[in-house]
Amino acid sequence: MVALAFQGHLNPMLKFAKHLARTNLHFTLATTEQARDLLSSTADEPHRPVDLAFFSDGLPKDDPRDPDTLAKSLKKDGAKNLSKIIEEKRFDCIISVPFTPWVPAVAAAHNIPCAILWIQACGAFSVYYRYYMKTNPFPDLEDLNQTVELPALPLLEVRDLPSLMLPSQGANVNTLMAEFADCLKDVKWVLVNSFYELESEIIESMSDLKPIIPIGPLVSPFLLGNDEEKTLDMWKVDDYCMEWLDKQARSSVVYISFGSILKSLENQVETIATALKNRGVPFLWVIRPKEKGENVQVLQEMVKEGKGVVTEWGQQEKILSHMAISCFITHCGWNSTIETVVTGVPVVAYPTWIDQPLDARLLVDVFGIGVRMKNDAIDGELKVAEVERCIEAVTEGPAAADMRRRATELKHAARSAMSPGGSSAQNLDSFISDIPIT
């Protein structure tokens, strides 16, 4: 298993290995040296489902690692260093995260079958594939207002497409994406952290192009009613927030988190905090870095009054599954999207980049479990009234009951998919049986 040193890459891989722990397969997770220190506190975790191996990305330790430089170095030096790990031990299959097009080439060079663990939506894979393989017409991507019609997806605007496709991302990103599409010729399986019942029409629409195999939701087993296990978080977990949640009323707390990479902006923090105060609702807010919230007076006042908690990191699966949570204000990253689906929590969708805008469309218009929060059309700023509107819509508005009902339906469907005989469980069994064991 090959992943880069990002929480959004590592956690799905580890959970994938955990779900296959019942088999006689042995897993090694190879990741870059940058993850060594981050994972040091959990490296001896007795329940860890994989061995860890680290390889150099070819850059000095103090290099800032801007995306373009990192991508070039991984392709040149990372590939050679990964090959050394592979040569030390015979592997029967290599599973890689997306957007590392050099990994399938390394697998092919060693005559090892390769799978991609797609950690975005099936819908996102469909969009990327149809664009880069030129199977469907697309408008001029310079014009964000142009519409895009694709099978099994709602009518999209260019602004809804994954941002990595857009010309504004630059030539290097577009080259990387084209290389990823090309590397699919060396990929035998496209495994997706989703489940058939969630994206059935999209999955069916890809069956004659590049079949995708849903094997999720890849979440900690306790969310599926099984034994409770720790996740391999790269930030220290703040247990106080769970103790605080235990003291709150059922379905009363607004949970806010914009992921492990995006940093909160002070003006957005103040806007959302003011809306929370006006609504009079308790909140649990993950802000990174935490200092971004320390200068926001209205937020600090509410924390001092015991009306909310601010933490730099919390174990999201446990937070979302807590009975006190009423809704989730989210950036709509796919890991967060899957976790909110499995826990049955309605969302306020506030996407920013990559696949998040498309995930927001899925959450609101396909899954039916949330509303979209938008910046002002004139000045581009988030307004207090808009935040209040969205919180009301998902907690007590006329459509709130339907969202909650639909969220509960998807929660049960997710559990069924991973249960013995379920759609994802069957796909996992088929994948395992298809691996040529030497």
UniProtKB/Swiss-Prot annotation:
UDP-alpha-D-glucose binds at residues 260, 314-316, 331-339, 353-356. It comes from the Eukaryota. Belongs to the UDP-glycosyltransferase family. GO terms for molecular function: UDP-glucosyltransferase activity. Gene3D superfamilies: Glycogen Phosphorylase B. It is an enzyme of class 2 (transferase). The keyword Glycoprotein does not apply. Its EC number is 2.4.1.-. Keywords: Glycosyltransferase, Transferase. This is UDP-glycosyltransferase 84B2.
